[in-house]
Every structure is written in structure tokens, then in C-alpha cells.
Design a protein with these regions (language model features):
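Ferredoxin-reductase
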Residues: 1-92, 147-149, 160, 176-178
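Short, conserved phosphate/pyrophosphate- and ester-handling motifs at nucleotide-, phospho-/glycolipid
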Residues: 37, 121, 213
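Short, glycine-rich nucleotide/cofactor-binding loops
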Residues: 112-123
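Short, structured patches in soluble enzyme cores that scaffold and shape functional sites
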Residues: 25, 72-74, 98, 117, ...
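Reductase modules of NAD(P)H-dependent flavoproteins
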Residues: 141-245
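Histidine-anchored nucleotide/phosphate-binding helix
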Residues: 59, 122-134
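A short, basic/flexible loop-to-alpha-helix module at the beginning of a structural domain
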Residues: 98-110
Length: 245
């Protein structure tokens, strides 16, 4: 299928380095459905680019039929992220390929779910959280996130508001190097240590979803496996070139 033209409807600064983009189809037709956790292919052409550029960005919300929202981290050398952060404006048109990806939420209503992320890796998790909230997921849902500090912690309020729609939700946040202004915004300093949720690690059917830098995911997967979580209950997504955790 050819990419479809979408108009940038809204741009919001979600952290010092992450902006979200709300995108609506130029033709006004309903948008293709997707599974929470999937991504869009974003096609960008600009006179400054040597080539037509394509990047994948995770959707950050539950399917709603009328628009998409993605979040983009500004990478220092990033051609497309630089364009999205520096040049893109409301009203601009970009082309999108249909949602795709084999990392998505698959949890029966009876299954507890833990969503684990670091940095911009929270984007597919946010979509999963919205998906669980839309279904009023009856089993417990836990949100674990690691950020550098409060200025780099995106979507904190949205996570709290969305989690509040679930019957059994709790979240825990680690800041590696908190700022003075961060008091009260995080639970622990340093790197993510799953011993704080030790009781969840031995639940027989709990599903764990991970997204973040490769080193982070290896670190978390090792903690999960050491705690006895079965390999088949650990689901992960690697941003960038795919490597095996």
C-alpha cells in the first residue's frame, strides 16, 4: 500500500527532547486500526535531504479511528528527528505507511501486565497503557519507568491520568540523576531495581513488556530471568537496528 498523506494537527513538547505529533488524514477518511505497541512509517521529503527519508515511530495512544499520535525524540545527528523538531509545523503534510510491527499487547483480561521502559522507550508502553485503560483491564497493571531526570521524563501526567482509569494500577519511577526541582516526582534514584516489585515477579501468568536502549533491556531481562520469570512472559522491542537481547 502506498503511504497516505496526513496533516500535522498538533505538536506538543512532552519533555526537553521529545515532541508529540497528532496526525489526521488529509482525505478525512478513517485511519487504519492498529495494535497498541505498533509503529508508523513516517516518510519525509525536504529540499535539505539528500534522499527521501523513512523512519518508524511508535504510536502513543489507543486506536480511535480518526487520528494518530506519535512521539519523536530529538537525536543530535538525526536527519528526520531534526526536521520534526526544528522545521515541522502545524498544517504541514507528511506521508505515513500503515501501522506495523510484531511487538504489541497480547494479554487476556485475567493476566496482570507490567510495562517497563527507559527514556523514549515509553512510547509503545504508553499506547499499551491506553489500550488497557480503554478495555478497563481488570487484572493489575504496573508501570515502571527510568528517566535521567524530570526535564527528560515525558508524559508523566498522562501516565498518571490514564493509570487512574484502571481498577488496579501502580507506577514506580527511577531518576538516574534527579535535579533539585524533581523532588516528589520520582520514587527512587539510580538505575531500575526490580526488587521493589519482587512480589509481582513470581505471579505465574504476569506478562512483562520492555522497551528502551539495548543495554537497559538486557539489564532488566537479566533481573526478570534471575527472579524466575519464564522467558515466554518477557516481550521486548528494540529501537534502531535489531539486536537480540
Amino acid at each position: 500500500a502506498l503511504p497516505i498523506s496526513f496533516r500535522i494537527e498538533a505538536i506538543e513538547q512532552q519533555s526537553e527532547v521529545i515532541k508529540s505529533f497528532t496526525l489526521t488524514p488529509v482525505d478525512g477518511k478513517p485511519v487504519a486500526d492498529f495494535q497498541p505497541g505498533q509503529y508508523l512509517g513516517v516518510h519525509v521529503q525536504d529540499p535539505d535531504f539528500a534522499n527521501h527519508e523513512i523512519r518508524q515511530y511508535s504510536l502513543t495512544h489507543a486506536p480511535n479511528g480518526h487520528h494518530y499520535r506519535i512521539a519523536v525524540k530529538h537525536e543530535p545527528q538525526g536527519t528526520v528527528s531534526g526536521w520534526m523538531h526544528g522545521k515541522a509545523k502545524v498544517g504541514d503534510v507528511i506521508n505515513l505507511a500503515a501501522p506495523a510491527g510484531d511487538f504489541f499487547l497480547q494479554a487476556a483480561p485475567s493476566m496482570p501486565v507490567t510495562l517497563i521502559s527507559a527514556g523514549v522507550g515509553l512510547t509503545p508502553m504508553l499506547s499499551m497503557l491506553h489500550g488497557l485503560a480503554a478495555e478497563k483491564h481488570p487484572a493489575p497493571v504496573t508501570w515502571l519507568h527510568a528517566a535521567e531526570n524530570g526535564s527528560l521524563h515525558a508524559f508523566a501526567n498522562e501516565v498518571a491520568e490514564t493509570g487512574a482509569q484502571l481498577p488496579h494500577f501502580h507506577s514506580y519511577t527511577w531518576y538516574r540523576q534527579p535535579l533539585d526541582a524533581d523532588a516528589g516526582r520520582f520514587n527512587a534514584q539510580g538505575t531500575m531495581d526490580l526488587s521493589v516489585v519482587a512480589s509481582e515477579l513470581n505471579e505465574p501468568d504476569r506478562q512483562f513488556y520492555l522497551c528502551g536502549p539495548v543495554g537497559f533491556m538486557q539489564f532488566i531481562a537479566r533481573q526478570l530471568l534471575d527472579a524466575g520469570v519464564p522467558n515466554q512472559h518477557i516481550h521486548y522491542e528494540v529501537f534502531g537496528p535489531h539486536k537480540v537481547v
